[in-house]
Amino acid sequence: MSFFSAAKQSLGNSLIKLGTSMAQNSQGPVDDSSLSQLENLLPPLQILTARAAMAAMNMSNDTSMSGMNMTNSTTPMSGMNMTNSTTSMSGMNMSNSTTSMSGMNMTNTTTTAKASSCKLSMYWNWYTIDACFITKHWHITSKHMFVGSIFGIIFMMMALELVRRGQREFDRWCVRRFSPASNSCCHSGAPVHSGPSMALRIFLHFLRSCFYLVQYIVAYIAMLLAMYYNGYVILFLFCGTFFGYFLFGADTISTKASSSVQTKTIVQVADEKHEHDSSQYSDTTPTTE
């Protein structure tokens, strides 16, 4: 404030001297002494004006306002220069602020639009980009992502048929391992029944339940995907089921034949046992004469 007050006082004194000399010159012809006096006053006036402008830009709003008023009261040209520079700086700051705020708003708007751009429909549709399935993280943002999702759906349905095939093979193994026909001695006498223990039965049934749980989960996910009514998804659900059954479902024909053979074997063993019991009963029956 001391520098600014001193500059203001010096500038005021210079203006008083300049006004006095101009008043004297207006009453008579301009002489050489008046011109030399004006030339001596102009350089200090320009220096003080520049210093006042720099001080006004670096100080607070009140100081800058007083600096602007002081400069406007000195010389029209210097006031215009300082006003223009202040206006330019404020215009640049306002432009930068506006650009920054608009950029931030545009970014936020774009992010919000991208986060809420999932296309959902309760009718038949063929959406590819911006389609969402089951969760918000499964958001299709490109064609490559959509193709990868389609292949994932196909492999999921093929894996379902593979699990079903695994359960059938496990059931066949259990039948072969613990079937009464496999433990019978048809040619030496009555069949010997040696079934699995209770703990083994519980363990085997637990494994079969795990197979069933996996099938149920995959089938439920397939149902949820189909509920989006996307034509591509439903089409490739069918394709995955077809390819899966084509690769892993060929055993169903032989299963029926093997089951009928096993049934005939069990019936044959039962008939032989019945005949054996009948022969023993006839041997022990006393004959009457």
From Swiss-Prot:
Biological process terms in GO annotation: copper ion import across plasma membrane
Described function: Required for high affinity copper (probably reduced Cu I) transport into the cell.
Gene Ontology CC, one term: plasma membrane
Domain of life from the UniProt record: Eukaryota
InterPro entries for this protein: Cop_transporter
Positions in the Cytoplasmic compartment: 164-232
Lineage: Eukaryota, Fungi, Dikarya, Ascomycota, Taphrinomycotina
Family: Belongs to the copper transporter (Ctr) (TC 1.A.56) family. SLC31A subfamily.
Induction entry: By copper deprivation, and repressed by copper sufficiency.
Compartment(s) of residence: Membrane
Protein name, as recorded: Copper transport protein ctr4
Keyword line: Copper, Copper transport, Ion transport, Membrane, Phosphoprotein, Transmembrane, Transmembrane helix, Transport
Sequence positions bearing Phosphoserine: S279
Major localization listed first in the record, in broad terms: membrane
GO molecular function annotation: copper ion transmembrane transporter activity
